């Protein structure tokens, strides 16, 4: 699905959760400067990942295809990651996908939507935290923070989860009180519900991560190639190739 004229210029001009309401149905700073490449190692009993994030700019742009990770190009195909920040594989996919977003600048619109497990309060609340940070122009910063600290907040007692997220909000430079209130705002919940409904009802997704191109699920993605050696450029290169193939683009097409 390409961008419609009705939704294609959806900067957060309205400022607060109200800006999100209009589109529910369908990192660095908010100044627009680019993120510095950062690297943080995270380990689990079976996994170690160094999150060497790419230098990409926070777009502060959302439309009915999700939150944009690269500059919107009118008429270009759209690829979307459906993510669950409580899933370790999703954290790895986020890293590869952000690198792909940078490589696809000017060729494809790269967006992300939420697909948290309906049975996990940790999954739901982490999605709400990213959405609340997005209102203050820090989608990427919060998403990256949750990926880097996943084992920490997933092991917290549920009653301490909001405290953890508020600590992260402070670390990435958010207005913590505003962040806390926004997490409980109905417009944020509505936006999350819209993502979940589209993933489950319309696309029949039962897991995360998943990818779509022009709103069609990519059935043949080899997730071993996405998730192995994710610190290297290889997974992103694989994703770029698969996304372009699904969109019917040659390797060199730019819009």
Indicate residue ranges for each PLM-predicted region.
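Short amphipathic alpha-helical surface patches that mediate protein-protein
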Residues: 16, 147-151, 184-187, 197
